[in-house]
UniProtKB/Swiss-Prot annotation:
<dbReference type="InterPro" id="IPR045865">
    <property type="entry name" value="ACT-like_dom_sf"/>
</dbReference>
<keyword id="KW-0067">ATP-binding</keyword>
<feature type="domain" description="ABC transporter">
    <location>
        <begin position="2"/>
        <end position="242"/>
    </location>
</feature>
<keyword id="KW-1003">Cell membrane</keyword>
<dbReference type="InterPro" id="IPR041701">
    <property type="entry name" value="MetN_ABC"/>
</dbReference>
<comment type="function">
    <text>Part of the ABC transporter complex MetNIQ involved in methionine import. Responsible for energy coupling to the transport system.</text>
</comment>
<keyword id="KW-0813">Transport</keyword>
<dbReference type="InterPro" id="IPR003593">
    <property type="entry name" value="AAA+_ATPase"/>
</dbReference>
<dbReference type="GO" id="GO:0005886">
    <property type="term" value="C:plasma membrane"/>
</dbReference>
<feature type="binding site">
    <location>
        <begin position="39"/>
        <end position="46"/>
    </location>
    <ligand>
        <name>ATP</name>
    </ligand>
</feature>
<keyword id="KW-1278">Translocase</keyword>
<comment type="subunit">
    <text>The complex is composed of two ATP-binding proteins (MetN), two transmembrane proteins (MetI) and a solute-binding protein (MetQ).</text>
</comment>
<dbReference type="InterPro" id="IPR017871">
    <property type="entry name" value="ABC_transporter-like_CS"/>
</dbReference>
<dbReference type="GO" id="GO:0033232">
    <property type="term" value="F:ABC-type D-methionine transporter activity"/>
</dbReference>
<keyword id="KW-0029">Amino-acid transport</keyword>
<dbReference type="GO" id="GO:0005524">
    <property type="term" value="F:ATP binding"/>
</dbReference>
<dbReference type="InterPro" id="IPR003439">
    <property type="entry name" value="ABC_transporter-like_ATP-bd"/>
</dbReference>
Length: 338
């Protein structure tokens, strides 16, 4: 579906030294998947996204969409290729002097639809995004979430194969963000549209994406299935993002002053549902104190992380045996202190 091959993007201000915004990125995005690109501001993710519809041209490398090298197109051929690629934005980009229906109709007129087919398609797509009753409203009368729904309706009205989402929830509150992500998931499942989404929030990635690429300094530093990236982050930057998302930082005071051994335990799949800690308490006679933890469900797979304290003041070898038992029954054990 989408092939990004060794893409670099350089920007030059005046006669200054070029700044490399995207640095040697290669990715394959399969048809029908929801692919996320995550990174902090300035990571290059927006620039990379814009190469997929040639709003930004690569300085080096190639971008192929549906078997066509879109990075090499211009004129009529580029306009035709872009009709198969919808895009939504952080700040909606609606025409404020036109109604909701006319905002959506505009994209169909621009694509050359017959006049008689535009109104039925507008009604159909507004029903899909839950705005059938807002067709004659103006953007100023809408909430932020409703405005983004108009943006989505406009982007998918022309039956695109690909939908590009540029920080689609960053201007919205948490509850509204969840409804927009649910709508995107519905569109992907119902229409089979490939979605490429960029965000700075790992929670968005966790909620909606099948696979993810992590960007830092213009490079993709890690990519893979979302569950695997959360469960086994390899790059230090990814580890930082995941740790911040799961919020498992232990206060330094506890790390320094609590007796016994401190462990961070990763549970995956079935192991997240087993009474491993109860087993070690009974079998080895150690005291188990849960200091921090949570179980997340990514897709339908459980990912549990616990920070625990193990103590056995009169039997130090019991703690070592308990740790070894936990290692055998869980995905990963990290000794924080002890």
């Amino acid at each position: 579906m989408i092939e990004i091959e060794k893409v670099c993007v350089d920007f030059t201000a005046g006669r200054g030294t070029p700044t490399r915004a995207v640095d040697d990125v290669s990715l394959h995005i399969a048809a029908g998947e929801i692919f996320g690109i995550v990174g902090t501001s300035g990571a290059g993710k927006s620039t990379l996204l814009r190469t997929l519809n040639a709003l930004t041209r690569p300085s080096q490398g190639r971008v192929n969409v549906n078997g066509v090298e879109i990075s090499a197109l211009d004129g009529k051929a580029l306009r035709q290729a872009r009709q198969r690629i919808g895009m939504i934005f952080q700040h909606f980009n609606l025409m404020h002097t036109r109604t909701v229906a006319k905002n959506v109709a505009f994209s169909l007129k621009a694509a050359g639809w017959e006049r008689s087919k535009i109104a039925p398609r507008v009604a159909e797509i507004l029903t899909l995004v839950g705005l059938a009753d807002k067709a004659n409203c103006f953007p100023v009368q809408l909430s932020g979430g409703q405005k983004q729904r108009v943006g989505i309706a406009r982007a998918i009205a022309n039956h695109p194969d690909v939908l590009l989402c540029d920080e689609p929830t960053s201007a919205l509150d948490l509850e509204t963000s969840a409804t927009i992500l649910a709508l995107l998931r519905q569109i992907n499942a119902q229409l089979g549209i490939t979605i490429v989404l960029i965000t700075h929030e790992m929670n968005v990635i966790k909620s909606i994406c099948d696979r993810v690429a992590v960007m830092s300094g213009g490079k993709v530093v890690e990519s893979g299935e979302v569950f695997d990236v959360f469960a086994h982050p390899q790059h230090a930057f990814t580890q930082q993002l995941v740790s911040h998302t799961l919020n498992l930082t232990l206060p330094e005071r506890l790390r320094e002053h609590l007796p016994g051994q401190l462990l961070k335990i990763l549970f995956i799949g079935d192991s997240a549902e087993q009474p491993v800690l109860s087993e070690v308490a009974i079998k080895f006679g150690v005291a188990v104190n849960i200091l921090h933890g949570k179980i997340e469900y990514i897709g339908e797979r459980a990912l549990g992380i616990l920070v625990v304290q193990l103590t056995a003041p009169h039997n130090p070898t019991a703690v070592a045996a308990a740790v070894e038992h936990i290692r055998q029954r869980t995905a990963q054990v990290e000794v924080i202190r002890g």
